[in-house]
């Protein structure tokens, strides 16, 4: 299965690209969004793409374009680096595609897929950090349960965590399909519309890569370094990250209605004036896109414009 960029046309429209602007694609992946952004940039425009997967970075290095640079690392660290590199000149647009790529899922040795057997690794950057199988081995039942509940919103987190912990005491779980079988046996009722391992794999991956902290940090950085009337565009794939982005936009978003309870106090006026962004809208994939690319079915595109 080849990687198809999700909501490509909608993303490019949302960025509202200025020909001579400076843009950041925080998640290069297979380069689909990056290549499309380059089509809209003028000769003096700049595009910086970031990825913490060395294989993706090596793909990016094959793009020979003086307007383009590929950077290896986490977007929470590399976005501020790009800002400083450009002498603190404000950015014209930032894109974050928060999903894992089809290429990563298809690589058995990465451990992201619950449909293929491979080593339980799950690190986006597999040159550093602890692989998933080692974390599961060293963790207590309570630690595993907490992660499954917090990051996977798994209703059977207690049953699954006990099953994982007890199995690891006898024999170390190192393979993806071994973990899948343990999950299946632990769950009393299987949802016919969702694979039983979906939430557990999601939770472990989020924990191993510290994805939520990364996202929250990057949201705060982005609204500080974007130009006025320029946009932050984010593609979310699961309810947890979608909720974080939605609430962040809501917290920092401009209030366009008059609050109840007149007269308005000075404190309320300051709160309204201090809003940093205008929430544009959210976009979901059309039925035609979902039919062509099933991966897109859970995607939500959220757009915020700086004030």
UniProtKB/Swiss-Prot annotation:
Q: HAMAP family recorded for this chain?
A: 16SrRNA_methyltr_H (MF_01007)
> What class does this enzyme belong to in the EC scheme?
transferase
Q: What is this protein called?
A: Ribosomal RNA small subunit methyltransferase H
Query: What is its biological role?
Result: Specifically methylates the N4 position of cytidine in position 1402 (C1402) of 16S rRNA.
Q: What is its EC number?
A: 2.1.1.199
Keywords assigned by UniProt, alphabetized: Cytoplasm, Methyltransferase, rRNA processing, S-adenosyl-L-methionine, Transferase
One of its Pfam families is Methyltransf_5
Question: Disulphide bridges in this chain?
Answer: none
**Biological process according to GO:** rRNA base methylation
Subcellular localization is given as: Cytoplasm
Domain of life (superkingdom): Bacteria
* Family indicated by similarity: Belongs to the methyltransferase superfamily. RsmH family.
A single GO cellular-component term from the record reads:
cytoplasm
């Amino acid at each position: 299965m080849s990687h198809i960029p999700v909501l490509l046309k909608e993303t490019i429209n949302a960025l509202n690209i200025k020909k001579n602007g400076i843009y950041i694609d925080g998640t290069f992946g297979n380069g689909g969004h990056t290549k499309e952004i380059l089509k809209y940039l003028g000769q003096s425009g700049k595009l910086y793409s970031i990825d913490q997967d060395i294989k993706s970075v090596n793909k990016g290095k094959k793009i020979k374009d003086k307007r383009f640079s590929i950077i290896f690392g986490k977007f929470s660290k590399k976005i501020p680096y790009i800002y400083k590199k450009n002498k603190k000149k404000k950015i014209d647009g930032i894109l974050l595609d928060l999903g894992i790529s089809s290429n990563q899922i298809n690589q058995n040795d990465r451990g992201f897929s619950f449909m293929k057997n491979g080593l339980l690794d799950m690190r986006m950057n597999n040159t550093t950090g602890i692989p998933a199988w080692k974390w599961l081995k060293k963790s207590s039942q309570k630690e595993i349960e907490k992660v499954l509940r917090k990051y996977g919103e798994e209703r059977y987190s207690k049953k699954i965590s006990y099953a994982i912990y007890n199995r690891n005491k006898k024999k170390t779980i190192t393979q993806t399909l071994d973990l899948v079988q343990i999950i299946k046996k632990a769950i009393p009722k299987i949802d016919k519309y969702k694979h039983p391992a979906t939430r557990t794999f999601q939770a472990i991956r989020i924990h191993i890569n510290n994805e939520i902290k990364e996202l929250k940090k990057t949201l705060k950085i982005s609204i500080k370094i974007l130009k006025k009337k320029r946009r932050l565009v984010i593609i979310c794939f699961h309810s947890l990250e979608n909720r974080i982005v939605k609430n962040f936009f809501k917290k920092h978003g401009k209030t366009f209605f008059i609050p109840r309870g007149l007269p308005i106090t000075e404190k309320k006026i300051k709160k309204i004036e201090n809003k940093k962004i205008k929430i544009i809208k959210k976009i979901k994939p059309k039925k035609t896109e979902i039919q062509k690319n099933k991966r897109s079915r859970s995607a939500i595109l959220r757009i915020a414009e700086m004030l």
